[in-house]
């Protein structure tokens, strides 16, 4: 039952606050995958931003980056993209950078390169209220479906560490056959 749900689970975007011993917030995407011999595992792309430098404009301007990373994950999983090509797509997303709410480049992320231009759907964060809710030093992580493949928006807030109940909710619609 788990594999049936896992195989069709969406790509999830996340924003994870700084936690014990880690002075960085983590933004990224995680997707279900299966190798040629049938082993299931998640594939993850992350970007770390110093927690002390985080401000809401970072998330406000992250939509194109999430879109591009989700697209790269989907292509890799569905079409067997070579690792070098996948890495190139992720690095290109990072070089494209983030846009701030004002449309300019954010100083924190200036190391990522110039801002990206793209379609309006790619420029809107799927969860527009998130920048107002996310606390870089809090204990709640936020998860929402990546919509690069047309998946409907689903959201989740999770208190505490990354654990079985969280991944069960994301990848098996709450079914935990091993529990």
Predicted regions and their residues:
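Long protein-protein interaction modules used by eukaryotic assembly/scaffold proteins
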Residues: 20-179
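Acidic/glycine-rich phosphate/pyrophosphate-binding loops and surrounding catalytic core
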Residues: 13-14
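N-terminal ordered "arm"
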Residues: 1-10
């Amino acid at each position: 039952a788990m594999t049936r749900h896992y195989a069709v689970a969406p790509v999830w975007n996340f924003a994870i606050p700084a936690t014990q011993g880690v002075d960085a917030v983590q933004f990224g995407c995680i997707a279900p995958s299966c190798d040629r011999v049938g082993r299931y595992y998640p594939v993850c792309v992350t970007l770390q931003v110093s927690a002390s430098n985080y401000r809401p404009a970072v998330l406000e301007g992250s939509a194109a980056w999430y879109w591009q990373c989700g697209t790269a994950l989907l292509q890799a999983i569905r079409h067997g993209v070579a690792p070098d090509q996948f890495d190139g797509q992720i690095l290109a997303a990072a070089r494209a950078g983030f846009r701030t709410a004002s449309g300019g480049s954010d100083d924190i992320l200036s190391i990522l390169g110039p801002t990206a231009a793209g379609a309006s759907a790619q420029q809107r964060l799927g969860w527009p209220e998130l920048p107002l809710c996310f606390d870089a030093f809090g204990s709640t992580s936020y998860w929402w479906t990546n919509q690069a493949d047309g998946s409907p928006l689903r959201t989740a807030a999770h208190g505490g560490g990354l654990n079985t109940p969280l991944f069960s909710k994301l990848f098996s619609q709450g079914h935990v056959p091993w529990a």
